[in-house]
Curated annotation (Swiss-Prot):
Protein task: Involved in protein export. Acts as a chaperone by maintaining the newly synthesized protein in an open conformation. Functions as a peptidyl-prolyl cis-trans isomerase.
Molecular function per GO: peptidyl-prolyl cis-trans isomerase activity
EC number: 5.2.1.8
Organism name: Sulfurovum sp. (strain NBC37-1)
UniProt-listed HAMAP family: Trigger_factor_Tig
Taxonomic superkingdom: Bacteria
UniProt name for this protein: Trigger factor
PROSITE patterns: FKBP_PPIASE
The keyword Membrane is assigned to this record: no
Keyword Kinase recorded: no
Main location: cytoplasm
Amino acid sequence: MKVEVKKIDDANVAVQGNIENKVVEANVDKLAREAGKQMKVDGFRKGKVPPHVVKKLHGDKLQQDAEGDALRSLIDLGVKEAGINTADILGEPIFKKYDKKDEGIEVEVEISLRPTIEAEGYEKAVPAFEKPEATEKEVEEKLEEIAAQQAPFEKIKRKRMVRDGDTVVIDFEGFVDGVAFEGGKAEKFSLKIGSGQFIPGFEEQIIGMKYDEEKTITVAFPEEYQSKELAGKEAEFKVKLHEIQEQVPAELNDALAQKLLQDEKATLDTLKEKLKEQIVNEKTSKIYNEELKPKIIEALVAHFDFALPNNIVEQEIDAKINAKAREMSEEELNDFKENPEKVEALREELREEAENSVKATFIVDALAKKEDVNVDDQEVSQAIYYEAMMSGQDPQQVIEYYQKNNLLPAVKMGMIEDKLFGKLLGL
């Protein structure tokens, strides 16, 4: 078997060759002999099935496997002749030609390699950055906000009527056509008037009630109400007002700081310093995500010049097309399926964006190695766990979802990217 190897650029090599029929036939014979040693066919002892019988029973499969073996041999030969280190090969080859002729199969494939990146001079691509500060006013506002959140509800001493915005404690029971319905009853229920927690019209009719007053409220369930039995129906609620509550602002003192920081030695000044640090971090995070990160990626992509592996670029284009397809209507999708030229036009439209994305990924990988930036699997799991907790999801289920859908490498790469850029920016 002869091959011709042609270097396209530093990241891509073309391998051309012809797989002769006799090579495929020899592979078919070999596979048939091996299969016959494992098969059980009526009329033959197990493991003694002749090759010609195996071919008759599984000819198409043998032919397919034989061609596959020959193709792999051709590619391996091309890799050897090109002096390629197999560790540098990325993904699967791109097939440019696979033509079956009378004398054999004409093959042309492109093999993609890991780019070589000289990680030098990139420091000048890092944008200038002045770390933000937290003003005394911002710290005081944050402190007051936290104090308000910590403020407990207390029964007001003066017995007045309910106003909009009050928090009340009530008993209620609902009836439709004179019959109490499931889930329509509660005692000593705390409700903030104007919150919209109840169906329209309920909270408004609480306004003006007095302590220990009992009242019947008439409302109508919305047509789209979740319970079909109640949707659109009129209901009566018997309501009793027990008390009106108001929040008593927490005192800004050392005791509040100790409670919030879970530290008996903490003072109000300690809390203020923590809040100042938090405000600075929030401002920095906002600037980083909205301004610095896009700038540094753009600058690094412009700074480095190297060949990209074609198969990885094509995969990125595929991913972007799939993302767009998920946003298309059924009519738009059918239009693309029926017009291959539109798909090709879209691929070319997305090519530059895909190339920049792939380029940025290889740059980050190279610079992370140079700067000794690492993220281990435990850090990835902790980040996903924290994100799940903050969004009210089951952390274990979220982690399993990421594992099942092979999303952990992307999360890890994103964390490495942020850690690297943070180091370069001095954050």
